[in-house]
Amino acid sequence: MKMEIRRDITGSILDIGGGGEGIIGRIYGGQVIAIDNREEELDEAPDCCEKRLMDATALQFPDRSFDHVTFFYALMYMNRDEQKKALGEAVRVLRPGGKIHLWDTDIDSAYPEPFVVDLEIVTDRFSVHTSYGIVKKDAQDADTILRDLHDLGLKTCRCEKERGQFHIVGEKAPEQ
């Protein structure tokens, strides 16, 4: 599936699961601190932003540290409990008025057969063809993630769904 990503985020960005292809880091460079819980994924990512080994369910940043938090095909690698904790941590480190940006996929079943999504990612700076795959018992869908964000007090700014892929943007209240 072809996916176009516009360079439209200003301010500081925490990219959760930012290892591997490092898509968000490649687009936004010095605006980004990319974290991943696997050192080999960080080693594989291009050296275009700051990279840190860290667990998304226990972020080592103070409250209200970032203007934006991104999850680019990262939630699919977490079970439901980890997803909820990671989203809660993302809201904690998000500044009032900041936004969470999620790109991911609906997964009906990824067990026992693996689930794989094949993407062609196009930006104004580069294009890359990659696949993301997982074997896990938890399913996921955009509606569940939307409910999680709502339960955390975020307002939905964008929810685009196309052929099983989704892009959701949630905004933290200015006074939250």
For each predicted feature, which ranges?
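Conserved alpha-helix/loop element of class I SAM-dependent methyltransferases that forms part
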Residues: 1-11
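Class I SAM-dependent methyltransferase SAM/SAH-binding core
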Residues: 14-58
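C-terminal alpha-helical "lid/dimerization" subdomain adjacent to the S-adenosyl-L-methionine
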Residues: 23, 103-159
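A short acidic, Gly/Pro-enriched loop at the edge of an enzyme's catalytic core
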Residues: 57-69
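A short SAM/SAH-binding and catalytic strip from SAM-dependent methyltransferases
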Residues: 68-82
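A short glycine-rich, Lys/Arg-flanked "PGG" loop and its adjoining helix->strand segment in the class I
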Residues: 84-96
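Core SAM-dependent methyltransferase catalytic element
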Residues: 152-176
